[in-house]
Amino acid sequence: MKISRSLSTVEVHTGGEAFRIVTSGLPRLPGDTIVQRRAWLKAHADEIRRALMFEPRGHADMYGGYLTEPVSPNADFGVIFVHNEGYSDHCGHGVIALSTAAVELGWVQRTVPETRVGIDAPCGFIEAFVQWDGEHAGPVRFVNVPSFIWRRDVSVDTPSFGTVTGDIAYGGAFYFYVDGAPFDLPVRESAVEKLIRFGAEVKAAANATYPVVHPEIPEINHIYGTIIANAPRHAGSTQANCCVFADREVDRSPTGSGTGGRVAQLYQRGLLAAGDTLVNESIVGTVFKGRVLRETTVGDFPAVIPEVEGSAHICGFANWIVDERDPLTYGFLVR
């Protein structure tokens, strides 16, 4: 066996959604910003993403993040988010996973009852706070990036579902938000194939019709996914939602950046008051909470700073190797 690369990871899930943290084995990443480092990886080392996200080491719905040095004075570390299609600008469930791992594993100075974790991401600096009792990490809340509605009541035409109307909003990534009830789309595991088809068609049509660009971060210039809302299964939840993103990937969690965007959407539509909490349920019944911290602006857009809360758990540690003799060493996807 000839090992050309060895990578160490911490395996975490947030509300059921996997997050693989790469802690060692990456090449040195040039660049003064996280976006520059991500661009270098895309151009020069994308095979690492494929090796860790694709089968046989991963699967079609895998997600992860590469730890890197911070680029801002208040950050403890930086992260580059990866998934089956490529690289994302923000990942709320990843922030919760990273913050939990940082506290559980002592990557940051821990304080009781709450420990602060600063993370540099492609979308900007994110500050998280982890409950810590001296032995165990608890729920994580993070201050999301400024979030806003980009367009209201926009329509797209899809091959299988006809005209679909919703809002395009930003919570760290752009999403097309739509009510699933008119299309008989319950947010349940049993409907996942229909949810995937609907979400993928809406995302493709929206990207073809609406050329989004973040007013302050021009590199964020596409609609990342479709978020489909419907009735929750738990009495205490406000709603359930399913995020179909990247290449037909389904988020098992309620989607952190999507929850931030939903908070902005509901607040700006007058459906969520200051001080109220959105209890957002996932396709598997796990929950994130979101609320408005304060109002702000992004370019010419009125916006809010949301806070999002959820929990994560470490479920393993792994060492992965790349053997160039293996014809499948950089992975494959059946779906």
From Swiss-Prot:
Its Enzyme Commission number(s) read 4.2.1.77
Q: Which key words are in the record?
A: Lyase
Q: Which InterPro entries match?
A: Hydroxyproline_Metab_Enz, Pro_racemase_fam
- The residues the record assigns to binding substrate are G92, H93, H222, G256, S257
Q: Which domain of life is it from?
A: Bacteria
Which residues are responsible for catalysis?
C91
Q: What class of enzyme is it?
A: lyase
Gene Ontology molecular functions:
trans-L-3-hydroxyproline dehydratase activity
Keyword Lyase (UniProt): yes
The cross-references to Gene3D superfamilies, in alphabetical order and at most eight, read:
Diaminopimelate Epimerase, Chain A, domain 1
**Catalyses which reaction?**
trans-3-hydroxy-L-proline = 1-pyrroline-2-carboxylate + H2O
PANTHER family assigned:
TRANS-3-HYDROXY-L-PROLINE DEHYDRATASE (PTHR33442:SF1)
Q: How does it assemble?
A: Homodimer.
What NCBIfam families does its record include? Answer: TransHydProDhtase
Role according to the record:
Catalyzes the dehydration of trans-3-hydroxy-L-proline (t3LHyp) to Delta(1)-pyrroline-2-carboxylate (Pyr2C). Does not possess neither proline racemase nor 4-hydroxyproline 2-epimerase activities.
The family assignment reads: Belongs to the proline racemase family.
**Name of the protein in question:** Trans-3-hydroxy-L-proline dehydratase
Question: Native species of this protein?
Answer: Burkholderia cenocepacia (strain HI2424)
Gene name as annotated = lhpH
